[in-house]
């Protein structure tokens, strides 16, 4: 096995994993995701651990969380205030559809129905594709038949061995 082939086999498994990690990192950076603790089933949601990435510290760290003090009740606009014990900071657990440091940004997802022009264009392109496939198949079949009919047929002749002792077939 050559060195290039070995390197290709090693990279084949690692490149998709690296791209996946890069995709998650970019998704977090672009959407400015907030802290979403993942409590273990049976663990109290008032005191569990979460993976947190802050603007000041881009590393992901595991921290303990508790509820915020009563004076921080209005801190989160659309979510629940949580206190990160290990970092001594307040963060928000946003409601579904909200994001941001204080859950102030709303994700407005609008699903627009397909326009008639888009549907018509799609149908036309599919029909053109099918016509191309059928036409190519027809052309190939005719070419193959013409080529086969133009070849002279090979007729087999009886060949004798020339040896009188051998039986002739």
From Swiss-Prot:
Propeptide: 30-62, 109-169
Residue span, EGF-like domain: 64-104
Segments on the Extracellular face: 60-119
Protein name listed in UniProt: Proepiregulin
GO BP annotations listed: anatomical structure morphogenesis; angiogenesis; animal organ morphogenesis; cell-cell signaling; cytokine-mediated signaling pathway; epidermal growth factor receptor signaling pathway; ERBB2-EGFR signaling pathway; ERBB2-ERBB4 signaling pathway
Residue ranges of coiled coil: none
GO MF annotations, alphabetized: epidermal growth factor receptor binding; growth factor activity; receptor ligand activity; transmembrane receptor protein tyrosine kinase activator activity
Gene of this entry: EREG
Record's keyword terms, sorted: Angiogenesis, Cell membrane, Developmental protein, Differentiation, Disulfide bond, EGF-like domain, Glycoprotein, Growth factor, Membrane, Mitogen, Secreted, Signal, Transmembrane, Transmembrane helix
Annotated signal peptide: 1-29
Domain of life: Eukaryota
Function: Ligand of the EGF receptor/EGFR and ERBB4. Stimulates EGFR and ERBB4 tyrosine phosphorylation. Contributes to inflammation, wound healing, tissue repair, and oocyte maturation by regulating angiogenesis and vascular remodeling and by stimulating cell proliferation.
Tissue: In normal adults, expressed predominantly in the placenta and peripheral blood leukocytes. High levels were detected in carcinomas of the bladder, lung, kidney and colon.
Known glycosylation sites: 47
Subunit text: Interacts with EGFR and ERBB4.
Transmembrane domains' residue ranges: 120-140
Cytoplasmic side: 141-169
Single GO cellular component term: clathrin-coated endocytic vesicle membrane
Intrachain disulfide bonds: 68-81, 76-92, 94-103
């Amino acid at each position: 096995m050559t060195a290039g082939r070995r390197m290709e086999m090693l990279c084949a498994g690692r490149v998709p994993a690296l791209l996946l990690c890069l995709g998650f990192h970019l998704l977090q950076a672009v959407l400015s995701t907030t802290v979403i603790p993942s409590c273990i089933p049976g663990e109290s949601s008032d005191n569990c651990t979460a993976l947190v990435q802050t603007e000041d510290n881009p590393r992901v760290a595991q921290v303990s969380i508790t509820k915020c003090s009563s004076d921080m009740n209005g801190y989160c606009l659309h979510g629940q205030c949580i206190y990160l014990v290990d970092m001594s900071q307040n963060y928000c657990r946003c409601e579904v559809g909200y994001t941001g440091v204080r859950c102030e940004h709303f994700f407005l997802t609008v699903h627009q129905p397909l326009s008639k022009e888009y549907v018509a264009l799609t149908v036309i392109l599919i029909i053109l594709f099918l016509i191309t496939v059928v036409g190519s198949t027809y052309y190939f079949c005719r070419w193959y038949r013409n080529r086969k009919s133009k070849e002279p047929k090979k007729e087999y002749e009886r060949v004798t061995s020339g040896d009188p002792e051998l039986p002739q077939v």
